[in-house]
Amino acid sequence: MEANFVSSALAGVQNNRSVKRSLDRLKSLFSSGQHQLNGSLGKKVFILLALGGGAFSLVKFYKAKNEGSSKQSGLIIDLKDKNSKKDKKRNVTRVDAVFFRRLAKIIRIVIPSLKSKEFLSLLYLTALLFARTMLSVSIAEIAGKNAQNLVARKWKEMRNGVLKFALVSIPASFVNASLKYETDMLALRFRKRLSEYVHKEYLEGVNFYKASHLGGADRIDNADQRVTSDIEQFCNSMSSLYTTLFKPFLDLVLFTRKLVVVMGWGSPLLMFSYFIVSGFLKKLIMPPFGRLTAKQSELEGNYRTVHQRLITNAEEIAFYDGSRKERQIINLSFGDIYNHTGYVSYLKCLVGIFDGFLVKYCASIVGYGCMVLPIYTGIRGSSGKDSTELTKDYIRNTQLMVALSQAIGQLVLLGNKVTLMAGYTSRVSELLEMIKSIKERGTSQFTIVHEDDVPNPLTNSPVNDKYDTSVDMSSWLEDWRKRSDQTRIVKRQQSNRSSASGATTVYGGGTFVEGDFIKFENVSIVSPEGKLLVENLDFQVMPNQNVMITGPNGSGKSSLFRILGELWPLHCGTVIKPRKEDILFVPQKPYLVLGTLRDQIIYPHSHDDMKKLGVTDDDLQHLLATVDPNLTIIRQWNWDDTKDWFTALSGGQKQRIAMARLFYHRPQYAILDECTSAVSDEVEGKIYETCKKLGITLFTVSHRPQLRAYHDYVLLFNGRGGWEWSKIDHDDDHLKKPLSH
């Protein structure tokens, strides 16, 4: 049946005159070329490879080298300075001389010598690839002979052919499974070698500290992402790239050699010519997958970072009741990943459609032409063969042509994987280059920058002329207090519609009661480990009565505030306190949210929340000016500037930001945990004066005696479960009326 189909197809083609004339011209071309090719078979194969596979590789690498003109939108939440020239330079990911130089350096790390396990594994993988190609050629020969015997009804030969196929399938199965295993193991060995090298260099001395704190221009983002995920992806990509490159090239050599023997050089040349044209067409539409891959890794690193920040600053965020804001940040970060991944998947889909049409289906059409032309032209005696011989040649040549077209197609698609690998190579190389730069710099001293050499932010600021310094701050603070009181009244009215005032909540073994003051009645503070920190605590704080809390480390000072913030359950007793939004915690190391300068002041509010409250940027400037008299912050940055504020701000500026945040929210009670240690005595005094004007009652954790002037009571923990409550006599500057337990 197969032979009849082939004969009918050829007869139909020959009956069409127009097609026949075209085939006659091709026949003369093929015949002349066949007689002119008198050199060795190796020379013929070399010419075909030079015209075919080499051209495809050049096309793809030329495409990759000149990619990068496309632009991709950046992060909604950027964890580094977008204006950094260093970052802009790093974001360029191309397959160029820099890529090959970086790749060569990494290869010398993962394959240190010819005697290494990695190189031996590479040799074994090469042998498996060669064996697989030879087995494919054998299977094609067996399939062709089996088809011939089937058409000729030679059942004995057919049985022997099936037996040969079964015998060949045994080593073929072993080779196929071993190829997958060795590819994975090679990637794993690469990762082990590269990870150990990075660990050695990154953790040598204090390089890890310098990388995150003293890196300067060499500091990079998401070092943890690069050390873990990016190294893994790079090693997987490099291992896969070797098999993707070597096997198609080997198939190209062996299958072309076999096809030239049985079909002549015309059909392979036609196939090569088609793929050259399709390669140039593909070059025109190929997106910059290398840069998109690097962007994907960056977004994944940012997503991991926001989760790490949540874990690291969990207590501060809980005190601020910032879960809603953090959820928005995390959702935005994941949204960036979702949008970018969807965009990349869409591009891959379009490229896949183009690849499927050109590389698979159109290549099959060209392959059919390659199969028909040798038979029609009579090359290699095809015209004199009977139907069984034609069937054998058809089946065998079909399998060889399919394998050859797949090999060429893989070489055409090789550029995709190279550009993807370029993204991971860039990420890993930046990490290695940063470590090398830090080691070369060693312990060299910092360069002194004189004030005359840099622009003065106080005179070159975009908001320098916008801030009105003539405002009477006392009057403005009084007005701010009235506005805050009105806002609090509205919020309470809205809240009371859904819950009764003075609500009682049983939490753990004790009871929380809502009130306008703070009172502890027979409260024992127990740590999560079961340690009794404070026993039977009993005191009361009315509005405008500031309390100073002292005691040794681990005595229960911070634990008291965890009880107030309802982070810990009550072991026993009763706590009367205002609503959670009326108590604000200011830690020693302020929490700085991902976002703009404005977000640092209004956290956990959003910009829309701020507008709904009727607060303007001018109000924020006045609040910040109360703790930053020299206006160093508001004159150096705009409110919409986005930076890594943890590194951009000094210790004193961070504490000023935290106090401005306190004044913005203006709670009834505030807990200050050594939060003024980095500001001057003058600014510190102004902070306490402002709190008094705004009607904020303070709990201050501090051991500095000079702060007693701003407080009315002292709560002392002795570290053994005992405590002492005393009133401060400001006339004699000492404590009186102690109440101990």
Curated annotation (Swiss-Prot):
Record-level Gene Ontology MF annotations: ABC-type transporter activity; ATP binding; ATP hydrolysis activity; ATPase-coupled transmembrane transporter activity; long-chain fatty acid transmembrane transporter activity
Swiss-Prot/TrEMBL GO biological process terms: fatty acid beta-oxidation; long-chain fatty acid import into peroxisome; peroxisome organization; sorocarp morphogenesis; very long-chain fatty acid catabolic process
Disulfide bonds: none
Gene encoding the protein: abcD2
Subcellular location: Membrane
Chief site of localization: membrane
Protein name according to UniProt: ABC transporter D family member 2
Keyword Nucleotide-binding applies: yes
Keywords: ATP-binding, Membrane, Nucleotide-binding, Transmembrane, Transmembrane helix, Transport
Source superkingdom: Eukaryota
A GO term from the CC aspect: peroxisomal membrane
InterPro entries recorded: AAA+_ATPase, ABC1_TM_dom, ABC1_TM_sf, ABC_transporter-like_ATP-bd, ABC_transporter-like_CS, ABC_transporter_sub-D, P-loop_NTPase
Record domain ABC transporter: where: 518-740
Record-stated family: Belongs to the ABC transporter superfamily. ABCD family. Peroxisomal fatty acyl CoA transporter (TC 3.A.1.203) subfamily.
Organism whose genome encodes this protein: Dictyostelium discoideum
Membrane spanning stretches: 39-59, 119-139, 260-280
Coiled-coil regions listed: none
Annotated ranges, domain ABC transmembrane type-1: 131-409
Residues where ATP binds: G551, P552, N553, G554, S555, G556, K557, S558
Lipid bilayer topology: Multi-pass membrane protein
